[in-house]
Structure formats: structure tokens, C-alpha cells
Amino acid sequence: KTAMEFSTTTARAEAVKTDAIAVGVFADGELTPSARALDKATRGSIKAAIQSGDMTGKRGTQLALRGLPGVAAARVLLVGLGSRDDFSDRAFAEAVRSVIKASPGVAEIAAAATEWAVKGRDSEWAARQFAIAAREAMFRSDELKSKKDDVNGPSKALLIVPARHVGAERGLKQGTAIANGMALTKRLGNLPPNI
């Protein structure tokens, strides 16, 4: 399987036609802007999931909602981001990896990850880290196996940005290049020295 491809879109969250769209929810039930937009488009489905206790917003949690009316995506993946005050670089990377790992059989996923604000970080940083963490979640070391592991995660990832944003596009390109280098290094490190 080829490496995951990344691109940006400026479409509104509810209008992105994709297999899955990932939006963030903080631990206090606070919705990120795209989650609020999806909640409005679905007449309260996101808030209903929070009020019922199905989604707590606790760091590392996810909830997939399928076939929501008013949303172009086939499923909405709510991603628990934890406490806004404690949301760090590490928490951002964990959230991205959890999105990818929670998306088996999905060919394309969109994520509003630039909204998952880490203090002191901009959208270029978020885009770069998104690409690195997503590719890291998809990495498999099976060069020497006769039967390769099935990689059934997304092959395309769309990063939703609020407006045409050169920094986010540059960050995605940088992140993709860094992820390619990291994957090559891991593959070479996993090979025996006599190859």
C-alpha cells in the first residue's frame, strides 16, 4: 500500500464529502468550531451524544456516529481531546493517532485538527504534526514477512482549514517529508545488518 496522501480543504465541515470526518470535543463538553457546525447541521446530534454520556471528551476517547442527516460525510468521528488547559503537543499527536487507528476500512478521512489548539502553536505546526502523527499511526514493519500485514487505514487525509492557508499547506508538505524520512529510517533500522 502506498503512503497516505495529504491535502487541505476550506469546505465547511458539514459539506465535506468523505468517508469520515473527525472533530474535537474537550473534556468539559466544549465543542471545537467544526464540531459546533456539525451539531447545528444535525440539529443537536453531537450535544446529544455528550449529554447521554456516549462521548465524555476524555483524552483518547472516540465515538463514531453514522448517517447523520445534514452532513455530507458518511460518519462523524468525535475525538476526545481532554482538558483544554492540559492540551499539549503530545495530546495533539495522540488525538491524531487515535483518529487514524479508529478508522479501519476508511479510504479517506477529513479532520479539523487545526482547531485542536495547543498554546503557542499555529496552524502550520498543527498541519505538520498532523501529517507526522497520521503516518506514524499507519507505519507497519513487515518488509521481511512473507505475508504482509493488512493496512486498512485511510489512504487519503484532508485537513480542514478555515480559509486558504499557505502556512497549513506548507506544514502538511513539511510533515509529509519528515514522516517519509522517519518511515525510511524505521524500515532501515528494522532490517538485519546483512541486507
Language model features with spans:
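N-terminal hydrophobic/helix-forming segments and targeting peptides
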Residues: 1-195
